[in-house]
């Protein structure tokens, strides 16, 4: 059973029915603001390497012996791969400005397929030398399918040069920074986790932002404030494992979005890699999505570890009337979804979902982009979204109803994501003059 999320008051241009992507340019769609349904235009070099990259990145580290590899992170690594694909493809297409690398060699007549393959392969080999069993055979097979020619040779040389340039750009990205031991909070409002996750993100160099603090959130409500009491009591009532107020539909949504993000996002965003009729457009869409996704992650964790705010579990179990008389403790309270081991504010799912949704919105020039997402969590169904806003709204509700977040964290996280998307799309992936 599919879940359809319709918004009220949607108006269509006179005479316009649901608009499927093929057969019209992005400019035409943007000018008309027609609804867009994400459909596949068939396998292409971008979609092939998007899948190979996801399979490589999502391979459990223990299975590959990553001692000599960087600490993997799906958003950072997918962004790096897609930047290389974009710069290689766009050098041949000549329609848009490069993101990081302008090739020095001639590009005229180069095979776009060979260039994209060599660029993606070069980055994966550089990032994950011990995972060649995932990408080496695929690369060999992809190149074997291209007839020997000057176009093929130029494409491989071009893609290889771009891969080297992109790897050099991200060579000292900060994710291997040695961190001091984390000291759990002991005062009201402070995060209580032991050895929390993704602390390294605070040290990671963004792809486009000036630094991780550029869009730092304003901070959670003070514990004594009415806004905090509202957040507290909402999460307490709806996020509890024993809640009688949360509906079955709300529970399903919370579970749907509890799949590990690396697999959820790489699988569900794959459909966009073949949504355009031209490889250059697919490359630009995927690179912009993943760059925004990655920078939103960095920005979000900057705020998380700056404010170091406690999760609902600690807040509800340890509430004191002297802190806020409208917040009553429940020492046995537990969330329905296990809480991630990093600070609560802002919500990372809101940050990256908003960044992704607003990037898609800006690419197509409308929020009326319909698509479907699936979750690997048992008991969930396919979710259909009619607008990009629907996805953002759903993820905010999911984190509250799952008992992992307060509402303010979800709304402020969405603001970060929107700001990141605007920054990325207004300054990068632009048409050539």
Which ranges hold each PLM region?
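Acidic/polar surface patches and capping/hinge elements
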Residues: 28-433
